[in-house]
Amino acid sequence: MNLNKIVNRLFSFLIFNLLITSCEPSKYEITSPVKQQSIQRVDVMPNLPTPFKIIDYNQIAKDYDRLVYDPNQTGPYWPLIWKDSSRKNVDQETYGIYTAMGDARQGITHYKGIFHESLASIGSVLGGSLVGVDKSNQKGENYVGMLRNYFNSETNWNIIMNNTSPEVAQLGGGYARDWWYDVYPNLMFYAVADFYPDEKGYEPILRSVADKFYEADQVLNGNYDYTFFDYEKMEPKKNWICSQQDAAAGHAYVLYAAYQRFKDPRYLEGAKSALEALLNLKENRFYEILMPFGAYVAARLNAEEGTNYDFSNLLDWTFDGDSVCREGWGVLVGNWNGYDISGIIGSTVGFNPVNKNLKDVESEGFGFLMNTYDAMWPLVPMV
């Protein structure tokens, strides 16, 4: 049989099968395609940044973990990790990571080693876990278990906080009560728990955090116009910092994660309540990092729970840089010294380097790399 006959028979066979299958009922539901949402600030970003280079973040994360979690590093400011034997909240040793190289407040020789931040510790455990590092048994150390010391039970707040005790806030650096600092560590802790579902001592902490956030949302009753929340007294508070209404996004994220884990309908109710408080805002209240998590929760609720939330305002507020509270806070767009910097989270307005109270009209703002990485967490799954 020559090649032409083989091709003709194969073609006839394919046509026959297509005709047969076209007569059968479809096994798949035909749905409308997802419409691409337009975000004004994204629309003006270049499709291809200049210069362009793909960064191997997977390898960078592994290298970071190997270097930072090596207590045998030597040299000025090294190692970057130390043990904290204060046994705050939980009767065990924990550990700290320098917030900045050579931070004079930190390390084993300063304040008995108690000054460290969960943003660094929990964040690095989460990052290592994402790239396959078992942080529950790394060279004999259970860094996952050590994170329990950030659960502030001794103060009766009973949530994961940025420090192991409030006295750390008095040691310098401006870490007084700042709502996002009290909420965001709980999002990260829930994410870590997802990688280690059977970690000893995690279950009651996760329950406590969810209960506290649910009760707080009930107290707030749709009004998040406060600087922080006292999770011991269950009272909203105000101080010199502007109101952080986007804390509602953090409550919503944790409560929906808790609902996924425990199937308690109260948590689903609380997630919706907190989200709706955020969606009902009339102006942009993006403060630090929590706003895009509200959009993420809304998208998941629409997809998984049959809701129909319009959360386009939350995405716009994340990007636009017109925050009422923190002026200019959003996503940068532009080219600095030949480098496209579009997509970096930070301030879209600059400040005078001599007098920080004066705006510098010549400046195009400044970026925060860690905030940018944090924003990828809720934004990328929505794309």
Regions found by a protein language model. Name each.
Residues 2-11:
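Bacterial N-terminal signal peptides that target proteins for export
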Residues 91-120, 163-183, 233-247, 278-291, ...:
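Solvent-exposed loop and edge beta-strand segments that line ligand/cofactor-binding
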Residues 25-169, 196-227:
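Low-complexity, Ser/Thr/Pro/Gly-enriched N-terminal "stalk/linker" regions
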